[in-house]
Amino acid sequence: MAAATAMHSTALAGQSLVKPVNELSRKVGNVEARVTMRRTVSKSAGSDSIWYGADRPKFLGPFSGETPSYLNGEFAGDYGWDTAGLSSDPETFARNRELEVIHARWAMLGALGCLTPELLAKSGVKFGEAVWFKAGAQIFSEGGLDYLGNPSLVHAQSILAIWACQVVLMGAVEGYRVAGGPLGEVTDPIYPGGSFDPLGLADDPDTFAELKVKEIKNGRLAMFSMFGFFVQAIVTGKGPLENLNDHLADPVANNAWAYATNFTPGN
């Protein structure tokens, strides 16, 4: 009788121990399932978006024909166009994709930097020089270069010092983007997130997928814009807003075709 009672007590104790363990396993299993699902969703983000997958818009619309097999709509901005086969090699494709995104971001910042001083100057804000390609030349003037026209901010008189600061600042940003450093571990150097996304704009996978498309589309436009700013500076010697005003005032006399036909080499 005592032995039977002891065995019954042991069985009850075993059941009472198993219940919490099973409950814990169930909860942990659910957490792991949620984590796994969240990671899976993040990997396949954009699968329901019109900008991804086989049915995404192509570079020639319905006349695009068959696109290369390696352009399958997995990445943002893929319109199926690679006539020269520049991205047929997977490693080259990955490298070109990273270069395009990074150059697009710098171009967007550059375009903003070209337009903003000229726009502020037209609004009454005084600058030493508002035209973007003339501003840097002030460093060679007798008084040097004052940032925002204020000598109490940054007063620069050495082009080498400015060059060194640019290398350090831009190099630090790129280094943190690729290697992490003080900003934490980086799992994706193209979209590092973390401290590079303080507002948490990319927390939702679907929103993140759409933002990737918007970024690369605007970045490509910005790269073309910067190229146009360079050409305008060489041909007209004016800033982009001044060129725009001239074109709006007299579109026939101020356009690319008119300047091209009037161009004389050596003059």
Swiss-Prot record:
Transit peptide: 1-37
Keyword line: Acetylation, Chlorophyll, Chloroplast, Chromophore, Magnesium, Membrane, Metal-binding, Phosphoprotein, Photosynthesis, Photosystem I, Photosystem II, Plastid, Thylakoid, Transit peptide, Transmembrane, Transmembrane helix
Species of origin: Physcomitrium patens
Record-listed chlorophyll a 1 binding positions: W81, S87, E100, R220
Residue intervals passing through the bilayer: 101-121, 153-173, 221-241
Binding site for chlorophyll b 2: R105, V154, L183
Chain sites annotated for binding chlorophyll a 6: H247, A256
Binding site for chlorophyll a 3: Q138, L148, E215
Reported function: The light-harvesting complex (LHC) functions as a light receptor, it captures and delivers excitation energy to photosystems with which it is closely associated.
Keyword Cell cycle set for record: no
Binding sites annotated in the UniProt record for chlorophyll b 1: F59
Protein family (similarity comment): Belongs to the light-harvesting chlorophyll a/b-binding (LHC) protein family.
Residues binding chlorophyll a 4, per UniProt: N218
GO biological process, one term: response to light stimulus
Protein name (record): Chlorophyll a-b binding protein, chloroplastic
Main location, first listed in the record: plastid
Residue numbers binding chlorophyll b 5: Q166
Binding residues for chlorophyll b 3: S158, E174
InterPro entries noted in UniProt: Chloro_AB-bd_pln (IPR001344), Chloroa_b-bind (IPR022796)
Domain notes: The N-terminus of the protein extends into the stroma where it is involved with adhesion of granal membranes and post-translational modifications; both are believed to mediate the distribution of excitation energy between photosystems I and II.
Topological type in the membrane: Multi-pass membrane protein
Keyword Acetylation: yes
GO CC entries: chloroplast thylakoid membrane; photosystem I; photosystem II
PTM summary: Photoregulated by reversible phosphorylation of its threonine residues.
